[in-house]
Amino acid sequence: MEIINCHVHSFTQAHTPDRFLPWPVPLLVRIPLVRRILRWVARLVDRDRKSALGRYAQIIDTSYKRTQREVFEIVRGFYPEGTRFVLLPMDMTKMNAGSVAVGIDAQHAEIVALRSAYPDSIVIPFAAVDPRHEGVVEKTIALIEQDDFRGLKLYPPTGYHPYDPRLWPLYEYAQEHNLPVLTHCSRPASVQYRGKPTPEMLTDPDSGELLDLGRFELLTRFTDPDAYKPMLKKYPKLRVCLAHFGGAGDWTRYLDKPWHSETERPNMSWLAKILDMLRADTYQTCGPTSATPSTPTMSTFTFSKCCSLTRE
């Protein structure tokens, strides 16, 4: 049986700004002594690393590896020989949380080298895209055509609408070449824009409406399943994967109040919204692509879910 882990992050602390997590966690864990104390406390109270503290300690420990290859080797060690991995870079340079030591272009370049270092295409790289970067369309297409990247990775909570017009050429290209677009879909997003919303962020690109929302509500709107409907309407064959399937909190909400008992859509769990999209005549699940030839349409993994949608 072939195994494909469809959601792997290999970035290190060099790719993250000082305030990418709530203050003062990122600043404190940059101090080696603090990390050692955290590891000691985590082992003391949670030997199996099953609690939130244990998981965070493991994440911090791993992120302080020097290279993405070191991080990847840790992940790979948990899987049998022949397992393939979808690598999803994260672009945190525009989230107004401080500068990063290594930008997204260099992060992509390291993934290119990482992919070349392993046989049998066990590394399946996606390209992180952010419409605020100049040349994002040309650079992304070059990664796909020259370096064999297999899809697009979005993370709208860092400060942009998923339907931003600057991304339309990439969506058209992805639709034409049957490439998947994987986007973050859970709330609250732990990695998110830290500044005051800009006029650009507060303008809905579909309706032109000026949104009267605070930062948290705005960023939540960016990754709401409903935010992808204009995209699917404009690009009816675009393959969109809503990573985490709404998130663990919305799965809990769904179990408390299933989709059929909801009365107001704004109050629906995101799981319910996604299930409605899958059940509707307008949408259908879609099969594998050349990027992930044996990946099932719905992939389940610990603490998160993923599904693909296309519009008929």
PLM segments and residue spans:
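Mid-domain alpha/beta scaffold segments of enzyme catalytic cores
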Residues: 1-176
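Catalytic pocket-lining loop regions of alpha/beta-barrel enzymes
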Residues: 150-151, 161-312
